Amino acid sequence: MKILVVNKKLHFNYEVLEKIEAGIELKGVEVKSIHLNNANISDSYVIFKRNEAYILNMNIAPYSHGNIYNVDPLRTRKLLLHKNEIIKYQMRIKKESLTMVPSKIYWRKNKLKVEIALAKGKKQFDKRQTIKDRDNSREARKHIRV
């Protein structure tokens, strides 16, 4: 499993409850561009329409050696999930007011996969508390070493 793109803002902005693996429907030049690490998933999220899952705001830069087949970098891309998974997560998102955010893109058995995190958004004071906890643990480790 080779990880290509990681959402570094995920654990700062969200509290992750569960992670799901999904396939993604891409064009050929998009796959080549992702392989060159020319993708950004930090602002992207998942929506459901007509019992299908789509990922929005996933920025895949145009392939440098591409031609007329280059597509819109921010186009909506379909996620490949089983129907029962879609229904299950759709109901859970509505009931618990959660969101689905991509956490990383990687290769698995010569296919690109997206790991999607079922998460709850953090408030501003939660983010501040996370920073304080991280600084306190860093200080504690520093004192242990000395």
UniProtKB/Swiss-Prot annotation:
Positions of region (Disordered): 127-146
Recorded family membership: Belongs to the SmpB family.
Location within or outside the cell: Cytoplasm
Record-linked HAMAP family: SmpB
Molecular function per GO: RNA binding
PROSITE patterns, sorted: SSRP
Role of this protein: Required for rescue of stalled ribosomes mediated by trans-translation. Binds to transfer-messenger RNA (tmRNA), required for stable association of tmRNA with ribosomes. tmRNA and SmpB together mimic tRNA shape, replacing the anticodon stem-loop with SmpB. tmRNA is encoded by the ssrA gene; the 2 termini fold to resemble tRNA(Ala) and it encodes a 'tag peptide', a short internal open reading frame. During trans-translation Ala-aminoacylated tmRNA acts like a tRNA, entering the A-site of stalled ribosomes, displacing the stalled mRNA.
InterPro entries: SmpB, SsrA-bd_prot, SsrA-bd_prot_CS
Lineage of the species this protein comes from: Bacteria, Bacillati, Mycoplasmatota, Mycoplasmoidales, Mycoplasmoidaceae
Organism: Malacoplasma penetrans (strain HF-2)
Pfam families named among the record's database cross-references: SmpB
Presence of keyword RNA-binding: yes
Name of the protein: SsrA-binding protein
Ranges of Basic and acidic residues composition bias in the record: 127-139
Gene Ontology cellular-component terms listed: cytosol
Domain of life according to the entry: Bacteria
